[in-house]
Amino acid sequence: MNVHFIAIGGAAMHNLAIALHNKGYQVTGSDDTIFNPSKSRLETKGLLPESFGWFPEKISSSLDAIVLGMHAKADNPELLKAQELGLKIYSYPEFLYEQSKNKTRVVIGGSHGKTTITSMILHVMHYHDRDVDYMVGAQLEGFDVMVKLTEDNDFIVLEGDEYLSSPIDRRPKFHLYKPNIALLSGIAWDHINVFPTYDNYVEQFKIFVDSIVNGGSITYNAEDAEVARVVEASENTIRKLPYNTPEYTVEHGETLLETPEGPLPIEIFGKHNLNNLAGAKWICQHMGIDEDDFYEAIATFKGASKRLEKIAESKTSVAYKDFAHSPSKVSATTQAVKAQYEDKTLIACLELHTYSSLNAEFLKEYKGALDAADVAVVFYSPDAVEIKKLDAVSHEQIAHAFERNDLIIYNNSEEFKTFLFSQDFNNKALLLMSSGNYGGLDFDAVKGLLR
């Protein structure tokens, strides 16, 4: 099968391209720019385009399929040529569904927790040598690729993202997978550039639950009131299976999970991660892993890439980096670190970097998000606001939104860096939360602060 990728350099797109190459397909692609790690991974497989840009001459009737990435625009020259030739054009999720029509599809959805839960499930399967197909949004320890597709495996585990499918298909990705087994971890308004109201956002999850095949199941977080409402209101003929955060204790900085065999030391921490673990456990049991085998495997799970990643530790201090940027994730992550290191002063730093977080109307959703921190810092770049064509936000708006009088706010990366590097980190816990990099912060240098 000959497949051409328009915008092959994307995080998801290049992984799908590599997965199809590994499956024996003929794969080509184009993009106007490609950064690492995508660039080096594509190069290793011989899939890196010879030149960057869009080349309509690459599109011919010999192609069996076009996979269109979100980075491409609706007037992309290659897309227009493919439409002119009447070629079959798939969005990323559409093509994944085509590859998994004859498998049991396990789809993990939710505003937060989906990457971690998907990673937990795959870790458990890998630990017990159970081979499954998958697509996950983070690099996992022990896994070479983030997408795997085979002809033989019975199960495919898919991280179900609610963002749009492609420039010409405005449906959320997770509407296209038609799960047999689904999980819903949480609903907290996000992506306001495409879901302008809370009700509009919640509606996408209702559609997701109704897309589960007849006789399938939804495992859902019963502690999230919106999730419970959405699932319980659905008239789809599916099994509805609630889960709750398991009992656990924290002793001397170590989390102990209560199991039928007694307390089990685990590597992850925080109530939100224990809640994720409960969901992963039920999905693994649906996939044939018994409870004891799940506990044995999950004890060795260190977390998904970029999620509560410990970057430095000394005798008296510790530093974590986390991808958290939405209000619910920021709140859960900050609470988790404080609960784990109650005896340390927590310095929590958040970069407002996404379209939603830099929107003056949406800012109020961050109310109380940093309350668990002893020292709370917010950084944002005026350049990021300008690039996203948003109205400027002021220090006063941010302070008012977080409802914290002692909030420290920076919009200059050098001033933020000066603050950070002037701190005494004795008996401190440092938490850096962002989907960006604080205007070019050297994380290796940050590690040196704790030595």
Label the model's feature ranges.
Residues 20, 175-189, 228-229, 265-303:
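A conserved, hydrophobic alpha-helical segment in the catalytic core
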